Amino acid sequence: MSKKRRQRGSRTHGGGSHKNRRGAGHRGGRGNAGRDKHEFHNHEPLGKSGFKRPQKTRRDVETVNLRELDEDIAVLVEDGIAEESDDGYVVDARDVVEDGYEADVVKVLGAGTVYNELEIVADAFSESAEQALEVADGEAVLSERGEELEAEKDSTDEEDEES
């Protein structure tokens, strides 16, 4: 049965109240009326925008400060995370950081003062961390992963210089 046939005998033919089909007031205006005021929410832009970094360039970096390592060294030795040696203490930063083994890179930052001789093994060090360790007669040792990252960085630097 057609809509026209179904609406026979109906006073308003599906328009609700008899007032609703008069003018354009029931619709809030005709066409694009009100698009900057009362119908503004209907005109938000859709779709993608912006820039997404390629997944291969993204790295999950976990950080730890020298201050934390130096202050907590006694607890770390007690828990078996750090080892005491003749020259001082040996710490693997991956063991200290909560998600160290899940992270792509574990980086040591240079905040704080170092009072103990620390030999820290990590994937990356900030310049200030390396300097602070040198001043305290400590050592910054790159892990295997850190050496791979350095090699990658050097190869990309050479490619950039050629182009």
Swiss-Prot record:
Gene Ontology biological process terms in this record: translation
InterPro entries documented for this protein: Rbsml_uL15_N, Ribosomal_uL15, Ribosomal_uL15/eL18, Ribosomal_uL15/eL18_sf
Biased composition (Basic residues): 1-29
Self-association state and partner proteins as the record states: Part of the 50S ribosomal subunit.
GO molecular function: rRNA binding; structural constituent of ribosome
Function (record text): Binds to the 23S rRNA.
Annotated SUPFAM superfamilies: Ribosomal proteins L15p and L18e
The protein's name: Large ribosomal subunit protein uL15
Originating species: Natronomonas pharaonis (strain ATCC 35678 / DSM 2160 / CIP 103997 / JCM 8858 / NBRC 14720 / NCIMB 2260 / Gabara)
Gene that encodes it: rpl15
